Amino acid sequence: MAAKDVKFGADARQRMLRGVDILADAVKVTLGPKGRNVVLDKSFGAPRITKDGVSVAKEIELADKFENMGAQMLREVASKTNDIAGDGTTTATVLAQAIVREGHKAVAAGMNPMDLKRGIDKAVAVVIEELKKNAKKVTTPAETAQVGTISANGESEIGQMISEAMQKVGSEGVITVEEAKHFQTELDVVEGMQFDRGYISPYFVTNPEKMTADLENPYILIHEKKLSSLQPMLPLLESVVQSGRPLLIIAEDVDGEALATLVVNKLRGGLKIAAVKAPGFGDRRKAMLEDIAILTGGQVISEDLGIKLETVTLNMLGTAKKVHIDKENTTIVDGAGKADDIKGRVKQIRAQIEETSSDYDREKLQERLAKLAGGVAVIRVGGSTEVEVKERKDRVDDALHATRAAVEEGIVPGGGTALARATLKLEGLHYHNDDQRVGGDIIRRALQAPLRQIAHNAGEDGAVIANKVLENSDYNFGFDAQAGEYKNLVEAGIIDPAKVVRTALQDAASVAGLLITTEAMVAERPEKKAAPAGGPDMGGMGGMDF
């Protein structure tokens, strides 16, 4: 086992603070509308330019092991905030740095770190209550667009697009962000349930120009196993032909004789039919087939449930207003499932999302939820160069998360104002002892840090701006860094999602509290590499002393 270095007390905290400062100073230049860019070197290709705090934090790795521990703890603040709220990473970093700095001074002055932490926690709880109390619900599309615009660093086109996407797919719908292949940024909305399986054979196409199959008011057979022979389902096919309606078969696969028979019938015009493979794999496939069955009001034909193909009747099949199939995707529009059944299924999936600990599973469950509850919207981000597209995509991602957060918990005045105003609530707070009071004062000073940093990045004096804002008793009054003016921020559309501000403060206080109460640090001692061995001496070669 490699030897370890151990640092104690002030020395440990001092090194950790250096790491915190290096990371925070690189991240905080991006804060606010006048925030600067940070250029990140890539091992191959062009460097990446970003104003996204968490992207900067993730790139920083320091040579000194102890400094690096401090930087990594601060990086954890940014990524945790990003995971929960999707935005506010720079605010969280600025808050954490301010709390750690002040806390470090207090511990150096001989105060009890545990009491400091208790004071910090008490003050944070009061501030969070204050934020919740003053949060204003987002109701109109215009308000939604404003939140998106602020998070996209003032680009109103992005805000509008996110607002439109949320209107179309609802708050449960999935909105994904992709890179476009051209200059324009565009929004694509898929209504109904879409899954990534196309027709099994091109002979099922009904529109040869577009190479798509469109079925109006079809029956839908949802079969779990492979179909190799149609013999067991002949009675069902006859019933479908007599009804005069098309049939869509969703099965694990359709091959051999079954596929040939279906194609021949389709070409002769006796049967309007199409077949697609079931989406997903393994257990996820079963769940998705069940989703389709609930959406279309049908049943999954599965031997596990004791249902055989021979016994299937028309009322076991699902129906929908329209099914659109192309080479890669199938879309079921307006399924005939009962609203209560769909609601029940949505509730069940939501419960699974709450329980799961895997990010991948959560993402897949959310996709299923969206397909049942709303729809899927895709924002394709364009730009003139690859670097620009990547930078804009970062901003669209941030804006999307911020907008979702605003719909969940409402909005507060932006520009760091809501946190700065919360300091007024901490003035008369009662603490058990003086050390705890100092902990509360640390939070009181730290809450002004984001407002001061936004002003500083805009070329103003942060302390002067903060005092001017707090002198005015109007809750929505603050500093518009973009225009360099004081105004009613909510009316001007400068707003932050309450969830983002709350999460940033909670995560910053949590990690900063841990750093303040650290008394020892252990890191691996770097091994000294042995000097490369020299060649043998050149003895015996006399006469070379000129």
Curated annotation (Swiss-Prot):
A cellular-component GO term for this protein: cytoplasm
Subcellular location, record wording: Cytoplasm
Catalytic activity: ATP + H2O + a folded polypeptide = ADP + phosphate + an unfolded polypeptide
Binding-site residues, ATP: T30, L31, G32, P33, K51, D87, G88, T89, T90, T91, G415, D496
GO biological process, alphabetically ordered: protein refolding
NCBIfam families (alphabetical): GroEL, PRK00013.1, PRK12849.1, PRK12850.1, PRK12851.1
Functional summary from the UniProt entry: Together with its co-chaperonin GroES, plays an essential role in assisting protein folding. The GroEL-GroES system forms a nano-cage that allows encapsulation of the non-native substrate proteins and provides a physical environment optimized to promote and accelerate protein folding.
Record-given protein name: Chaperonin GroEL
Organism field: Acetobacter pasteurianus (strain NBRC 105184 / IFO 3283-01)
Lineage, broadest ranks: Bacteria, Pseudomonadati, Pseudomonadota, Alphaproteobacteria, Acetobacterales
Gene symbol of the encoding locus: groEL
